């Protein structure tokens, strides 16, 4: 009888301890994510402000080239690339963390049910793999941006069509929001860890899961990220709009993510048409 009473009293006590541990982990995790977001957002804002203060290079066609694609006085190209990649990574943390944090928390929760050890380390490795993919995309974006900037400076005829080209790129990015490919990639980004797939339980598997998640996310955000690059990589308002779009479509209730993506697509298509209209003198 005493054993039964002890067991009965132990269950509520054990449940209380588990709930306390869960709450502590929940608030610690999200508190650290909030601090990381605030720090990266502040650094990004400061970088954008400093780049805006430098101005840009006026180009044929009535547009201005960002100094992000050009070396400052005394800078070497490796230095320019390192500076761009550093700020790109910080910017990606600020932009992607609001939609990534819930996925990392669900992964940590699923891990706690079956493993119970190294939860934070494995979650960090998933995040590291995720942002490693975004760093690689940043390197590719820098190479393409520098090449296009050099061509635009050497070929005035090409520079004159850049405003129309930007509008067409934005229009294409908006159209991408309506495709089945977008829906599939968005579904992969919203997939709950451990549901229908093997849960990554070791260091290598966690890293690979982060890489896979980063790939799906970068594919899903391809159109929106391209808008950021062509419209204004140092424009705080463009950055905020792209971040909001990514977060809303990723965190929408189950079954509504693609619908939200299409609504965003309508807005982007409208903006693309407006940019083209202004470029050809219709607006």
Regions flagged by a language model, labelled:
Residues 3, 8-10, 14, 84-131:
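Juxtamembrane transmembrane-helix termini in multi-pass membrane transport proteins
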Residues 34-38, 82-89, 93, 124, ...:
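Hydrophobic, lipid-facing residues on alpha-helical transmembrane segments of integral membrane proteins
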Residues 245-270:
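Interfacial loop-to-transmembrane junctions
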Residues 135-150, 163-191:
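Transmembrane alpha-helix/helix-exit interface in multi-pass inner-membrane proteins
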Residues 174-184, 205, 209-233:
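Alpha-helical transmembrane segments of helical membrane proteins, especially in multi-pass transport
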Residues 140-142, 216, 220, 271-283:
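Hydrophobic alpha-helical transmembrane segments in multi-pass integral membrane proteins
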Residues 2-89, 113-114, 152-160, 179-200, ...:
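Histidine-/acidic- and/or cysteine-rich, low-complexity loops and terminal segments associated
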């Amino acid at each position: 009888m005493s054993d039964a009473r002890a067991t009965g009293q132990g269950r509520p006590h054990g449940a209380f301890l588990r709930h306390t541990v869960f709450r502590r982990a929940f608030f610690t995790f999200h508190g650290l994510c909030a601090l990381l977001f605030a720090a990266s957002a502040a650094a990004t804002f400061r970088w954008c402000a400093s780049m805006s203060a430098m101005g840009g290079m006026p180009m044929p066609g009535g547009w201005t080239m960002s100094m992000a694609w050009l070396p400052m006085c005394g800078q070497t190209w490796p230095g320019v690339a390192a500076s761009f990649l550093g700020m790109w990574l910080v910017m990606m943390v600020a932009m992607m963390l609001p939609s990534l944090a819930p996925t990392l928390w669900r992964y940590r929760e699923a891990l706690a049910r079956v493993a119970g050890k190294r939860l934070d380390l494995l979650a960090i490795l998933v995040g590291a793999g995720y942002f490693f993919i975004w760093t690689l995309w940043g390197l590719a974006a820098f190479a393409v941006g520098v090449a296009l900037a050099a061509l635009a400076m050497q070929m005035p005829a090409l520079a004159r069509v850049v405003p129309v080209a930007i509008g067409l790129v934005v229009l294409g990015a908006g159209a991408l929001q309506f495709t089945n490919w977008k829906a599939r990639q968005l579904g992969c980004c919203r997939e709950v860890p451990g549901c229908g797939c093997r849960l990554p339980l070791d260091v290598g598997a966690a890293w690979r899961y982060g890489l896979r998640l980063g790939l799906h996310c970068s594919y899903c955000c391809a159109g929106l990220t391209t808008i950021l690059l062509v419209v204004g990589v140092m424009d705080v308002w463009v950055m905020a709009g792209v971040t909001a779009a990514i977060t809303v479509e990723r965190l929408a209730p189950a079954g509504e993510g693609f619908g939200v993506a299409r609504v965003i697509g309508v807005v982007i298509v409208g903006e693309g048409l407006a940019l083209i209209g202004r470029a050809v003198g219709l607006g």
